[in-house]
Amino acid sequence: YQLLTDFEADPKARREKIENAVKIAEKADVVVMLIGEHPRFGGEKAARVNIDIPIIQQELFRAVSAVNDNIVTVLFNHRPLDLREISAKSKAILDVWFPGTKGAEGIVNMLFGDTAPEGRLSMCFPRSVGQCPVFYNMLPTDHPVTLPSRFVTGYIDSPIEPLYSFGEGMTYTEFEYGEIVLDKSELHEGETLTASIKVKNVGDRDGYETVQLYIRDLYASVSRPVKELKRFKKVEVKAGETVNVEFTLTCDDFRFHNIQMEYVWEPGEIRIFIGKNSLCTEYKTVMLAE
């Protein structure tokens, strides 16, 4: 392997280093590209209006990706960035944010498969800065997301979904989800609701999966988010095995503050979603009773 560093030099030196990187990339089996923000781009009084990768790094990435499409990107960042081009031209992205003193060792172990990435995104990554703010628990509008007309919630030049959504993350195996099972179809105040689902590891390697439970209150006296994360469990599943993941919800999980700022329970229909991330669509319904 060969290591190349320090591309943020004067223009002439930068061009020479990029040309050298291209020559090496042409012969390489795989390119590991470490890119991202400067450490000073984050922290107190470090807001940005431009969430692109720095221009110098974009030049390097475009030049290398033009001669080698087997790129693994390691991303150092303080915030969600515009990764459209990086995502399209990378076989994988390992988002490490800004790790501590043992970060380098952990990154190497993950890249070589000695350990597996198990993290999940705590924020959405937009497709462009024009999509901001973008978050999974937005409020619904009077225009649906999909409809056979132009009067919908969305954009004419981009999908409405973020590039990477809240709760997303991959590892070195694959999981399949079964059907959601609820222990009751009607919930009264003072009772609990148990929701369960079977998760199977369909890969050839043991792994951990973070199973996430979201709810949606369809009808309420105030507008409620399209999804709310209420529970999650990180479970180990051996290759080829299936585990049953169970969640217990209490009445407080369905309460909210009304317009009088009272913490209330309102009868109505609740959808229970369980899946890999906030984009999950499979659900079962429970009715909140008087």
Regions found by a protein language model. Give the residues of each.
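Short, contiguous acidic/charged loop-to-helix segments that flank catalytic cores in large enzymes
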Residues: 45-55, 59, 95-99, 185-187, ...
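Terminal connector regions
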Residues: 250-290
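Secreted, periplasmic, or luminal enzymes acting at the cell surface/secretory milieu
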Residues: 1-9, 76-208, 214, 234, ...
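Intrinsically disordered, low-complexity Pro/Gly/Ser/Thr-rich segments with frequent PxxP/GP/PP motifs
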Residues: 221-257
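Short acidic, flexible loop segments centered on an aromatic residue
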Residues: 204-221, 227-229
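Domain-level signal for soluble alpha/beta catalytic cores
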Residues: 21, 193, 203, 220-222
